[in-house]
From Swiss-Prot:
It comes from Cottoperca gobio (Frogmouth). This is Hemoglobin subunit beta. It comes from the Eukaryota. One of its GO terms (cellular component) is hemoglobin complex. One of its GO terms (biological process) is hydrogen peroxide catabolic process. GO terms for molecular function: haptoglobin binding; heme binding; metal ion binding; organic acid binding; oxygen binding; oxygen carrier activity; peroxidase activity. Disulfide bonds: none annotated.
């Protein structure tokens, strides 16, 4: 069980209240697909992913990026039970989609970069620490089925 400080809880809720899902979600997923091209293999039904322009302009990438952020809302609302919150999603990604769990960390890193760019100087080291702790718990929960 993860212990959250009052500061961490407030920070996570505050960061997610400021995120523009329609901008950040697509940008984070697109960045992941561009920077780590091997992650594209899980999105074969998304059509053209041949270069950065195609990826960033792909409406299926954008839609799934938004879906990912809305999925993170569940963790924000259930910070004391993220593991069980993502139990079914963990099974889906491991048993049906066969996603390499290391890719969750790559996406989390890309999301951190995009959020930091959006927030600018307001994304202090303390805020980043809380945000990355939160994402690490999410990544661990999504990868739980693999262990």
């Amino acid at each position: 069980m993860v212990e959250w400080t009052d500061f961490e809880r407030a920070t996570i809720k505050d960061v997610f209240s400021k995120i523009e899902y329609e901008v950040v979600g697509p940008a984070a997923l697109a960045r992941c697909l561009v920077v780590y091209p091997w992650t594209q293999r899980y999105f074969g039904n998304f059509g053209n992913l041949y270069n950065a322009a195609a990826i960033t302009g792909n409406p299926k990438v954008a839609k799934h990026g938004i879906t990912i952020l809305h999925g993170l809302d569940k963790a924000v609302k259930n910070m004391d039970d993220i593991r069980n919150t993502y139990a079914e999603l963990s099974v889906l990604h491991s048993e049906k989609l066969h996603v390499d769990p290391d890719n969750f960390k790559l996406l989390a890193d890309c999301l951190t970069i995009v959020v930091a760019a959006q927030m600018g100087k307001a994304f202090t080291g303390e805020i980043q620490a809380a945000f990355q702790k939160f994402l690490a718990v999410v990544v661990s929960s999504l990868g739980r089925q693999y262990h």
